[in-house]
């Protein structure tokens, strides 16, 4: 039997249903950067709206991105789980963390509507060091769960791990001050010339584990736009919050 990593209940899934209900409730977020908005919970009538935070109303940090969705906030208890998955050599967390994403109807719908689901790529050096791309594992687990949720009548989203490439090795964004992150990541992504024609007029969903400033998402979205993508949405497991 398994023990819940949050409440330590026996027997339970890696993350039990009670903890998902308690700590991963849908929250009202900016539709463009996924920052948490000052509302305790998301009323049903808001789901189809596109609320914006004050910063995005003035000037978006991710102008190449059409929409942005996040499942949870990058804080307790999810920060510890994500860090173990990403840095602790435990790829087996992918399924449980993808479950936090499929708990949100808007995320399930976004995956169902996209033409292509692209995981945020790692540079080959970082991939070799870590041993796996956590965003690719999340994408695979998410697609499987969404497909199960929707039933066999709906085609699964297509995942392409090599269409979007990391063209240069950069300092990890998490090690840099916020002001330096955009400069660090500028020009670090490109779409494979062989696959660029297949992105023409496509609805693309870019998946990453954590969104902080949006610098990586913006740089990747710019490359996808340049290749001809008609719509670029960003989907993240967790969003950091303002201090």
Where are these regions (language model features)?
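Glycine-rich phosphate/pyrophosphate-handling loop used in enzymes and phosphotransfer proteins
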Residues: 1-243
